[in-house]
Amino acid sequence: MSALGAVIALLLWGQLFAVDSGNDVTDIADDGCPKPPEIAHGYVEHSVRYQCKNYYKLRTEGDGVYTLNDKKQWINKAVGDKLPECEADDGCPKPPEIAHGYVEHSVRYQCKNYYKLRTEGDGVYTLNNEKQWINKAVGDKLPECEAVCGKPKNPANPVQRILGGHLDAKGSFPWQAKMVSHHNLTTGATLINEQWLLTTAKNLFLNHSENATAKDIAPTLTLYVGKKQLVEIEKVVLHPNYSQVDIGLIKLKQKVSVNERVMPICLPSKDYAEVGRVGYVSGWGRNANFKFTDHLKYVMLPVADQDQCIRHYEGSTVPEKKTPKSPVGVQPILNEHTFCAGMSKYQEDTCYGDAGSAFAVHDLEEDTWYATGILSFDKSCAVAEYGVYVKVTSIQDWVQKTIAEN
């Protein structure tokens, strides 16, 4: 007569409370489970099954069943004496079935606050017969989340009114960065995505010789975003024609986390630098007392007529008669890559240290802020009538190409 084995499974909740034992092991603990009766020509094999509490599930390669061996060890066939673990089960309950129908399992990917889906599909994936999650538009390619740009939580109020400018409300200019040179000179930079910023070539060359390279410059800079959040610089890239196009890019070692204090500004798909259009410029530059400010300020400035701006800085009313004269003793770069913005009606203006900041324009239809220009000439300080900005649309191809290659 063949031997007959019997298995007793004790259901346990996340941990082993007690086990029964045969003749060779200790008697049962006082959990109320009776000792099983013996049978002729057979024996009792002691085993337990680990189970988890509600909303938890087993994390194990085995089935959770452990058998007591001759050495009084609890052993699982798949994992030996390694105990299973319980982990949170965030799965959905099985939906009820319907007559003449079936349940199609699908999930929708969504992004956290201040991020949006970057995908050709709608983010909805369906489980196919091969147990693969498939999107109708992109197949098994997963979507990505990218930073929202140009959507400040507390946008600047035009009713509120850096030279004598207005204090920034919380998060009005989350793209504004503060850059400090190795000789402790403060300038500006503008966040345009999670890892790249625009600034001027002049800012990058501060206290460096003309022979300095991008590799020489990067280690000498200190950069802050948000509320004095220090970020590490990986490299700087100068525009190939930076003597005429006063611009450079900064790449960070790590992507920044986007939130209400840190958010890139959008790059425009059209030119917003129309005469009379008002933009906002923020910065930590010098104030009316010619001292650097500890508080981010901003000012509203109108785009000026380019010809008038050129005549103003040439010191002549006739454009053909070029002279080195300038109301502030320094000649700005003025060409097809630049535009000018005049002082506000309150005689407010940008000043030393504001260069690298964005001329931010609010597109009311899209409710989005765009970097129309990057402040290049910040020496006006309410003495000259115009500040000079590098036009972002004229450098956008270079910006996108540089980011893609680096």
UniProtKB/Swiss-Prot annotation:
Sequence segments annotated as region (Interaction with CD163): 318-323
Q: In which tissues is it expressed?
A: Expressed by the liver and secreted in plasma.
**Localized where?**
Secreted
Which cysteine pairs make disulfide bonds? 52-86, 111-145, 149-266, 309-340, 351-381
Q: Which GO terms describe its molecular function?
A: antioxidant activity; hemoglobin binding; serine-type endopeptidase activity
* SMART domains referenced in this protein's UniProt entry, alphabetically: Tryp_SPc
| Pfam families associated with the record | Trypsin
Domain of life, per UniProt, equals: Eukaryota
Listed A to Z, the keywords are: Acute phase, Antibiotic, Antimicrobial, Antioxidant, Disease variant, Disulfide bond, Glycoprotein, Hemoglobin-binding, Immunity, Repeat, Secreted, Serine protease homolog, Signal, Sushi
Indicate the segments forming the Peptidase S1 domain, all copies.
Answer: 162-404
Disulfide bond is among the record's keywords = yes
Tell me what effect the entry lists for residue 129 to D: In allele HP*1F
So which residues have sugars stuck on them? Answer: 184, 207, 211, 241
Question: Known Gene3D superfamilies for this protein?
Answer: Complement Module, domain 1, Trypsin-like serine proteases
Provide the disease association from the record.
Answer: Anhaptoglobinemia: A condition characterized by the absence of the serum glycoprotein haptoglobin. Serum levels of haptoglobin vary among normal persons: levels are low in the neonatal period and in the elderly, differ by population, and can be influenced by environmental factors, such as infection. Secondary hypohaptoglobinemia can occur as a consequence of hemolysis, during which haptoglobin binds to free hemoglobin. Congenital haptoglobin deficiency is a risk factor for anaphylactic non-hemolytic transfusion reactions.
Protein family according to the UniProt entry: Belongs to the peptidase S1 family.
Q: Main role?
A: As a result of hemolysis, hemoglobin is found to accumulate in the kidney and is secreted in the urine. Haptoglobin captures, and combines with free plasma hemoglobin to allow hepatic recycling of heme iron and to prevent kidney damage. Haptoglobin also acts as an antioxidant, has antibacterial activity, and plays a role in modulating many aspects of the acute phase response. Hemoglobin/haptoglobin complexes are rapidly cleared by the macrophage CD163 scavenger receptor expressed on the surface of liver Kupfer cells through an endocytic lysosomal degradation pathway. The uncleaved form of allele alpha-2 (2-2), known as zonulin, plays a role in intestinal permeability, allowing intercellular tight junction disassembly, and controlling the equilibrium between tolerance and immunity to non-self antigens.
Oligomeric state and interaction partners are given as:
Tetramer of two alpha and two beta chains; disulfide-linked. The hemoglobin/haptoglobin complex is composed of a haptoglobin dimer bound to two hemoglobin alpha-beta dimers. Interacts with CD163. Interacts with ERGIC3.
What name appears for this protein in its UniProt entry?
Answer: Haptoglobin
Gene that specifies this protein: HP
